[in-house]
Amino acid sequence: MSNNKKLTSLFGAPVSDRENSMTAGPRGPLLMQDWYFLEQMAHFDREVIPERRMHAKGSGAFGTFTVTNDITQYTSASIFSEVGKQTEMFARFSTVAGERGAADAERDIRGFALKFYTDEGNWDLVGNNTPVFFFRDPKLFASLNHAIKRDPRTNMRSAQNNWDFWTSLPEALHQVTILMTDRGIPKGFRNMHGFGSHTYSMYNDKGERVWVKFHHRTQQGIENLQPDEAARTIAEDRESSQRDLFEAIENKDYPKWKTYIQVMTEEQARNHKDNPFDLTKVWYKGDYPLIEVGEWELNRNPDNYFQDVEQAAFAPTNIVPGIDFSPDRMLQGRLFSYGDAQRYRLGVNHWQIPVNQPKGVGIENICPFSRDGQMRILDNNQGGSTHYYPNSEGAFEDQPEFKKPGLKVEGEAYEYDFREDDDNYFEQPGRLFRLQSKEQQERIFENTANEMQGTTLEVQHRHIRHCYKADSEYGKGVAKALGIDINDVDLEVKD
């Protein structure tokens, strides 16, 4: 007698034959009453959910975050309340531009999203493996997506579209420079740093606020691929980073990262030379040193990729008391776009999917005002309890003890041009370039020339001009690699 599980329909009815359809005679047409065939095909036709518009190709794992340093002077967040405290977490790493089937070893930014299941609710910290971004206003989000993805006519990735967009934004040079360095192709997800990128805020139990940036430093060491190595890797294994992460965890070689913050007081922010909320710039560590916070380890692979990785939903609106937002325009834009994208992709009740549930609080303790919606399957839809406020039963009482400290804002509502406030586009990419060794600088030139193949002379001149303004040797090196005489480039044009 077989101990194998017996095949049933989705609703539990036994299936008598899984291979042969019901027909009118041995060679006749199929019958519509073959309900199992209909059920199978109808489900198959709907298996694929919308992929993420960005960060479509990803890998993830569960782990544990441990506090290693007391930062309660900055934040009242329970997750950081005492040294040694541990919190369950989930991490998802990804490429950005490629679709769900893209190769892992492409030159691209890597997504770096963390979900902490704290005892005050889920905290999502979304970021990348770079500390900056291409621009600083979210109105350009959709255009970036269009420029780096497939051309509407050819349906092919277009270097011209990509570089035309990047070079039309002088503030993009910092991110582009990072992307053209050796770190543009990490060997794997385990061998790269991560950044919250945005400026966030923290406040303590006295209501005192500071601005912070998050850093996650790999304990496996930084390792990258050169273009020829990446090409071989892609030819041999398109899932190289995913395989490396999965197999390391399966073999109990658990990857670890240390988390740090940079802290800027409100007074320092008011006197900062640049806009401290500008996502195209970093805070220099010499001025704002790294402060250790904790360490996290990924130690459990998902049992099912679709359930835990594909359906993982991150949104920077998922914060906890003691952590808050900032005037960073890009962060403000993401506060809407991330949650909205997840509601489109997974439905309004995606918070009930296991990987997204507030495990640290317990689903039974969730008391949301929201009801109904597709796939409301847990919490009995709050049963027959009161579903409005105010009410006479005291349901949905506020928790005023968790009010945030006030944030002073001023000014007229207007579409302010960032460039009129700050046109210091080139200082930081120039400084980054000079931090590279001569060999690393040469690779930046070579990588740039390779990536710019297929672009117009106008776009190439524009990029050379930006590089030259960051550092003359940077501009000369890129020009030489592209086979362009630097004297033929108008270096004084203001883009």
From Swiss-Prot:
This is Catalase. Coiled coil: none annotated. Belongs to the catalase family. The gene is katA. Residues 1-25 are annotated as: Disordered. It is an enzyme of class 1 (oxidoreductase). Its cofactor is heme. Signal peptide: none annotated. Keywords: Heme, Hydrogen peroxide, Iron, Metal-binding, Oxidoreductase, Peroxidase. It catalyses: 2 H2O2 = O2 + 2 H2O. SUPFAM superfamilies: Heme-dependent catalase-like. PROSITE patterns: CATALASE_1 (PS00437), CATALASE_2 (PS00438), CATALASE_3 (PS51402). GO terms for molecular function: catalase activity; heme binding; metal ion binding. It holds the Pfam family Catalase. SMART domains: Catalase. It comes from the Bacteria. The keyword Signal does not apply.
